[in-house]
Regions:
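Short, well-ordered beta-to-alpha junction loops that form the rim of enzyme active sites
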Residues: 8, 102-105
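Glycine-rich nucleotide phosphate-binding loop and flanking beta-alpha elements
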Residues: 44, 106-107
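An amphipathic, basic-hydrophobic alpha-helix
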Residues: 62-99, 107-120, 125
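N-terminal subdomain of nucleotide-sugar transferases
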Residues: 1-59
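Generic enzyme active-site microenvironment
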Residues: 6, 124-127
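Active-site loop/turn elements of alpha/beta-hydrolase fold enzymes
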Residues: 40-42, 65, 127
């Protein structure tokens, strides 16, 4: 099965933060599924659009997008919606059998719904 997985704050074990979506995606890959993760690259000073990497068999699409809790409320909203729009375009151009979206933020539902509609595939929304 081809899975398009959306998680704005995806981390690998080498990164600080939760790795639940990594563990789920890795398990799916180990079971023979294809997983394309759409996420953000929050590395400071790393700008330039999208980059792609292979993380233990998970094809990860990283969008350079500045974000921190120190941003103003408006700037955080802009970051959430920038990711929603960019990931909608990215995911809509991929091939998949299902779209799986993990919140937070809840705005992850926007690209998930768009990709599901555009590709006519089911959606799983994990809160």
């Amino acid at each position: 099965m081809k899975i398009i997985y959306l998680h704005q704050y995806f981390n690998t074990p080498e990164m600080s933060g939760g790795v639940r979506s990594y563990d789920i995606a890795k398990h799916l890959v180990d079971k023979g599924h294809s997983v394309q993760m759409i996420t953000t690259d929050r590395t400071p000073f790393n700008r330039g659009g999208w980059k792609v990497s292979d993380e233990d068999g998970i094809c990860v699409h990283w969008l350079s997008l500045a974000y921190s809790n120190q941003l103003s409320y408006i700037k955080r909203l802009v970051a959430f919606f920038s990711f929603a729009i960019s990931s909608s375009k990215k995911g809509g151009g991929l091939q998949g059998d299902v779209v799986f979206a993990t919140s937070t933020p809840l705005t992850i539902a926007i690209p998930a719904l768009y990709i599901s509609w555009k590709l006519s595939i089911p959606i799983v929304f994990e809160v």
